[in-house]
């Protein structure tokens, strides 16, 4: 039996009142004692023209690590799920020319002693949505100032690369019902002997 303490940490990067109240209401429904801290991330990235979403994500992660460590935590649990994993695998291949996956846990390189874990790694997105609806919760998406009404927006309308990958997987599933599990397992069955090049510990090994 492992004894541990939980801190339900919420970062407010600059939500409007509507979105912030959604978070507070969810916590009330679940009777969760959240710890909220505020940052100005949305204001910082709103005028960035090149890759604002990437910068925002990096800043959010950094602030979360810093605050968690300040509170004496040694792990951060994020909500990435099974569908996020397979989408990330395909995005890396089709848009990044690389084979890699989202790991279920990893040690921080910038915050000594901190570990990131993903407890929902094997949980399907549809199951999470069903749990949300059963409990009468509302999820916000990014909710930044580019999409300030994201409590009600349809994420399918956001033509991002991830949405494109979601649609591709849906199409492939019509032909092969096992395509999702096959994508997931593909990174479990990498045969180094048949790979032209690979990186290990930052060093590239190339057959050619």
Question: How does the language model describe each region?
Answer:
Residues 11, 52, 116, 120, ...:
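Conserved short-loop catalytic and cofactor-binding motifs
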Residues 58-71, 105-111, 165-186:
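Short, basic, helix/turn surface patches
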Residues 1-99, 103, 126-134:
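ATP-dependent adenylation/nucleotidyltransferase module used to activate substrates
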Residues 55, 77, 119, 123, ...:
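A short glycine-/small-residue-rich loop at the edge of a beta-strand within enzyme catalytic domains
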Residues 12-14, 40-42, 108, 122, ...:
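Short, solvent-exposed coil/turn elements at secondary-structure transition points
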Residues 84-164, 168:
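Catalytic subdomain that performs nucleotidyl-dependent activation
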Residues 137-208:
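The feature marks non-catalytic terminal segments
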């Amino acid at each position: 039996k492992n004894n541990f303490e939980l801190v339900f940490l919420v970062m407010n990067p600059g939500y409007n009142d509507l979105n912030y109240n959604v978070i507070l209401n969810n916590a009330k429904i679940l009777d969760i004692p959240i710890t909220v801290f505020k940052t100005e991330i949305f204001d910082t990235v709103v005028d960035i023209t090149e890759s604002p979403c990437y910068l925002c994500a990096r800043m959010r992660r950094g602030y979360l690590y810093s605050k968690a460590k300040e509170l004496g935590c040694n792990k951060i649990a994020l909500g990435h799920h099974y569908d996020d994993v397979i989408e990330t695998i395909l995005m890396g291949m089709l848009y990044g020319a690389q084979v890699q996956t989202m790991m279920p846990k990893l040690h921080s390189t910038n915050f000594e002693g901190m570990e990131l874990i993903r407890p929902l790694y094997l949980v399907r997105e549809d199951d999470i949505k069903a749990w949300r609806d059963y409990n009468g919760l509302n999820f916000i998406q990014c909710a930044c100032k580019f999409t300030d009404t994201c409590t009600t927006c349809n994420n399918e309308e956001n033509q991002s690369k991830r949405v494109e990958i979601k649609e591709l997987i849906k199409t492939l599933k019509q032909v092969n019902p096992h395509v999702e599990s096959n994508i997931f397992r593909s990174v479990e069955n990498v045969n180094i002997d048949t790979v032209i090049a690979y990186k290990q510990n930052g060093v590239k090994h190339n057959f050619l």
